C-alpha cells in the first residue's frame, strides 16, 4: 500500500479473485514491486527532506512471509528485496509478538467472516511467520524491539514511545 500502484497490488494480493492460486514467486515479486514504488515515491523523498518515516510493514515482511513461510530461497528473497529498496533500511523495527492462535482469534473477531487471502492460511503458516520474525529479531538485536503482544495497548504504547524517543532524539 501507500501509493496508487501499491494499493492496486494490495487489492490483487488480498482480495481479487485473480490472486487465488497465486504462486509464491508471483506473490514475492508483486510485494517487491509495491515496495519499490513505495520507496521511490514516498519513503526516499521523505528521508531526503530529513523526515522520520514510519511503515506498518517493510522488507522483513517479505523476508519472513515469502522467504520463510513460503519457503522461497533466502538468497533470492534477499536479492529481490535489495533490488526493490536499494539502501533503504529501517533504523528501528518494532515486533509485537503474539501466538498465532491468539492473533488469528483477534482477526476472526474483527472480520465478520471476511478474511483476506493471507488470513485464510493454515495455522502452520503463521507459526512459521512468527518463528521467522523471532529469528530475524535475534539476528539483528540492535534494530529490533520485541514486545509481548498480550500486554495492554497502553503498556505497549509506553514501551514503544520509550524506544522511539531513545532512538530518534
Segments predicted by a language model, with ranges:
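Generic leucine side-chain signal with a strong bias for well-ordered alpha-helical environments
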Residues: 5, 28-30, 95-98, 104, ...
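Hydrophobic/aromatic beta-strand patches that form the interior of the parallel beta-sheet core
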Residues: 54, 92-94, 145-147
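Residues within well-formed alpha-helices
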Residues: 45, 54, 80, 89, ...
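Short beta->alpha linker loops
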Residues: 1, 34, 58, 98-99, ...
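NTP-dependent small-molecule kinase module
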Residues: 101-169
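A glycine- and Lys/Arg-enriched "phosphate-lid" helix/loop adjacent to the NTP-binding pocket
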Residues: 61-131
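ATP-dependent small-molecule kinase phosphotransfer cores
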Residues: 1-85
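A generic structural signal for alpha->beta connector loops
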Residues: 50-51, 90, 141-144
